[in-house]
């Protein structure tokens, strides 16, 4: 996310913070017990938006366009140490900007006539690099959360400090309006494993309060929020989810999995009154702040189906984008995409459709990544993780989308899942299809062996690594998930 769980290389919420160096619990229950501990596999907001009858396409239409304005004057930047990424001329000292574009790069004595007499900016030896590319993030969920209060471990080492921040937020919020926090992670923040309604009642009893766990598959709320949702001891657990309860069977404010969280979140009026396109534009601005100039969504359609394309178009039409945007459509929506006649490469330099995303397994920290060997201490049918798509179906999907000209991106975390992905691409290559033609990828590619690297090179496949998970989950991988040798 950029995954908002710090699983992505760009964390749109916090930039590049330092986190505590050790986990309080190597694999806390709220992660290890969750069969969908990766937001790109199961989007928690989709159910809440459906229940709240929120139409993202309608929100997109409310986005104002930027007024026409004069183009900035030409600018010659000098005195720089420019890393060009051009092997023929790897270093330069100046560049010329015209009409908002870099028109020339080189050494000052070679500057074109157009550079004469224009405004100058002397960088006094500072280093300039090309903009960074964020290859795997999920824009609509980030946009939904961009104005929630960050109470995560990058800001607060303890749950008490996080709750104090929520208290400040509540005092600055009109009575009756929602106070929403995000990024809470009890595996890294000292204090209780869960934020119960009693703890959140200490934040406020005049506001509904809701907090998203950093996994996005666990939520916590106060008594006011439970009352708004009509949740009491008689409320049954939604299918595939759980309402946390105390010893007497009364709801304790802990909501496990999307359907349970949606029962509460749907009542947040900001869902309907917000503008997700504005949120997307804000995320682009946050990306710019850490040097990112192009972002790619890897799972379009899993949030609110084809309506997400309306959001992207409104972002483009606003004339206010500050970074380029690319996206891969989700295999889960294959029938709808085929019905709409979508093709690879449609769009322009600002917004373009570039990939077809297939999720083949789960997440390693959630013990659902498909592995050659069983997870530590795991038994039963899912001891080796889970395949989210049958092998023959994966083979067929890869072949079909390669024939259509798509850049196919296969989500594969476990080594067995990577084996299956490589096999699918290899079978297609035997049939005359070239995975390298569109730079096909294996997303996450987490548990990778040497022979798999060689096979990827042979097939012309690129890995898109979950860099953040090494920092965030490394100790858990060693101690509780894989063991030292595999980790």
Regions from the PLM with identified roles:
Residues 2-6, 10-15, 19-62, 67-79, ...:
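Divalent metal-binding segments
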Residues 282, 286, 420, 465-470:
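A glycine-rich, aromatic-flanked flexible loop/lid motif
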Residues 315-318, 342-351, 435, 456-460:
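Acidic (Asp/Glu)-rich catalytic clusters
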Residues 392-396, 419, 423, 440, ...:
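Feature representing long, continuous alpha-helical segments
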Residues 423-434:
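Polar interaction faces of repeat-based domains
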Residues 438-449:
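Aromatic- and carboxylate-enriched substrate-binding clefts and catalytic-loop regions
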Residues 447-487:
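Active-site-adjacent C-terminal substructures of enzyme catalytic domains
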